[in-house]
From Swiss-Prot:
Domain of life: Bacteria
Any GO molecular function: 3-dehydroquinate dehydratase activity
Gene: aroQ
Protein name per UniProt: 3-dehydroquinate dehydratase
Entries under Pfam families matching the protein: DHquinase_II
PROSITE patterns referenced in this protein's UniProt entry, alphabetically: DEHYDROQUINASE_II
The keyword Ribonucleoprotein is annotated on this UniProt entry: no
UniProt family annotation: Belongs to the type-II 3-dehydroquinase family.
Length: 146
């Protein structure tokens, strides 16, 4: 069974309590359960990981690139959190690993503060899902399934 890696970046471990007016009341555990259900529906294995550390996320993207190249993985769904707006290193990792990646944001970043309007990740992503809440994870998983 092929796999999809779901990566959540900094502060997403606080889902459910951090700014619920922006992100809703679903916890990270709720999101991971939703992703597992979506994976089962599409016949793919889902692996969920979260880190507040840029280097860890980069290492996981490199690992995913090797898994994709070996034919074991379909790609990555990633909510890069605030690294969206700051991390050229994540952009370079995605490009360098040649990993199909769907960038995902729970909130509509374009309707928020000006600094959130630019993404370093988007030019390296296969697609982007923004502002659809946690249901965006389900759509992102479906987008990677052939």
């Amino acid at each position: 069974m092929k796999k999809i890696l779901v990566l959540n970046g900094p502060n997403l471990n606080l889902l459910g309590t951090r700014e619920p007016e922006q992100y809703g009341r679903d916890t990270l555990a709720d999101v991971e359960r939703l992703c597992q259900e979506a994976g089962a529906k599409h016949g793919v294995e889902i692996e969920c990981r979260q880190s507040n550390h840029e280097g860890v996320l980069i290492d996981w993207i490199h690992e995913a690139g090797r898994e994709v190249a070996a034919g074991h993985m379909l790609g990555v769904v990633m909510n890069p959190g605030a690294y969206t707006h700051t991390s050229i290193a994540l952009h370079d990792a995605i490009k360098g690993a040649s990993v199909p990646l769907i960038e995902l944001h729970i909130s509509n970043v374009h309707a928020r503060e000006e600094f959130r309007h630019h993404s370093y990740i988007s030019p390296a992503a296969r697609g982007i899902i923004v502002g659809l809440g946690v249901k965006g994870y389900v759509l992102a998983i479906a987008a990677l399934v052939p």
